Amino acid sequence: VNDYTRKMMAFLLFCPEPRRILMIGLGGGSLVKFCNRHLPSTHLTVVEIDANVIALRAHFQIPPDGTDLRVIHGDGARYVAALIDSAEYPDVLLVDAYDRDGISRSIAEPEFIENSRRILGDDGVFVMNLAAHEADSTLHVERIRKVFGDPVIPVTVGWGGNMVVFAGPALRDRRRLEAAQENARRVERALDLDF
């Protein structure tokens, strides 16, 4: 599991037993494989815009769809917008959506961040990976802060310089923050993570 995947999994400190996780971006599948393995009672939905990435699913040993895993070919921003009127809100929204030009255009829009906030419940966690080469990382963090409010926690990842940004209602709950601090070392050891 690569460094930024480990950092993105820090959502477990704020939402240790998510019922539903929505992932925008499949990539090489490290996030979905980790969640599928370590969170067996969690329903995972992954939305990937590039059919060629989905076609490599078997090559990257990403498990097949089943009752708790579904990979959908589509635009993540549109999928999130469609969830606004749904009862199937995710507890956690993990965003790692890039194309050859950087962050996917529809994901970079302020409307996506606003819709993301609307689909997360009172216990929700929003996590976004911003690649090191993304020139507008500061702009993205400020957009997230404007929509979600403080705290927004940007964490620089290892030598590559990626930034993982955490936001959402769960981060404002003082009891959750205290519990997160107490549970961090236990979760790190159990899942071989580095928070």
Question: What are these language model-derived features?
Answer:
Residues 2-6, 12, 161-195:
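SAM/dcSAM-binding transferase cores
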Residues 32, 141, 184:
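Generic structural marker for isolated residues within well-ordered, non-membrane alpha-helices
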